[in-house]
Amino acid sequence: MGPNPMKMYPIEGNKSVQFIKPILEKLENVEVGEYSYYDSKNGETFDKQILYHYPILNDKLKIGKFCSIGPGVTIIMNGANHRMDGSTYPFNLFGNGWEKHMPKLDQLPIKGDTIIGNDVWIGKDVVIMPGVKIGDGAIVAANSVVVKDIAPYMLAGGNPANEIKQRFDQDTINQLLDIKWWNWPIDIINENIDKILDNSIIREVIWKK
């Protein structure tokens, strides 16, 4: 029961909605969970939305399970960063003698890994900047630019994106983070989808590892 998480296009006849694990798992320094999907604008695959991700920098992109990623979402990785201790112009890119001015890694503002949690909803045309961590269950409003971390189960939006409000009270959030339903075996998830959708899973112990 349920769709095959390794089938790129899980909806018959629909080439816009795509599970991203089979697309991204072949990329270096990328980890992605099952059932996370991208709703593309024009059929572009989600790997095209990850920019400036160069293996030499060794920064990782981690995306959890059951994430909903809207059209046009772009993830900017650390390779986009320029030196900022003087001129930001990348002279070395253009060769012809300028290549000798290649910056050292410790001269670049490397922000670390970019991490998107589980059950995260990212709206249309959101831009996620390098090194950001978006917590489990968070929602990011359309057209936002995420430049700093977003806490679990937080609604955030704007340019730059700010945390607007918690989706639930702190006790409920703590229970959801303890339950971690996205890590349940898929047969247990299948049996409890309605309870996952209305949050009644926090009122009973359904499954414990």
UniProtKB/Swiss-Prot annotation:
The cross-references to CDD domains, in alphabetical order and at most eight, read: LbH_XAT
Please tell me whether the keyword Repeat is annotated for this protein.
yes
Quote the EC number. 2.3.1.-
Q: Which GO terms describe its biological process?
A: response to antibiotic
Pfam families under this entry? Hexapep
Alphabetical list of InterPro entries matching this protein: Hexapep, Hexapep_transf_CS, Trans_hexapeptide_repeat, Trimer_LpxA-like_sf
Per the record, the domain of life is Bacteria
Extract one GO molecular function annotation from the record: acyltransferase activity
Q: Which residues form a coiled coil?
A: none
Q: What does this protein do?
A: Inactivates the A compounds of streptogramin antibiotics by acetylation, thus providing resistance to these antibiotics.
Assembly and partners are described as:
Homohexamer.
Q: Which family does it belong to?
A: Belongs to the transferase hexapeptide repeat family.
Q: Protein name, please?
A: Streptogramin A acetyltransferase
Q: What organism does the UniProt record list as the source?
A: Enterococcus faecium (Streptococcus faecium)
Gene, per the UniProt record: vatD
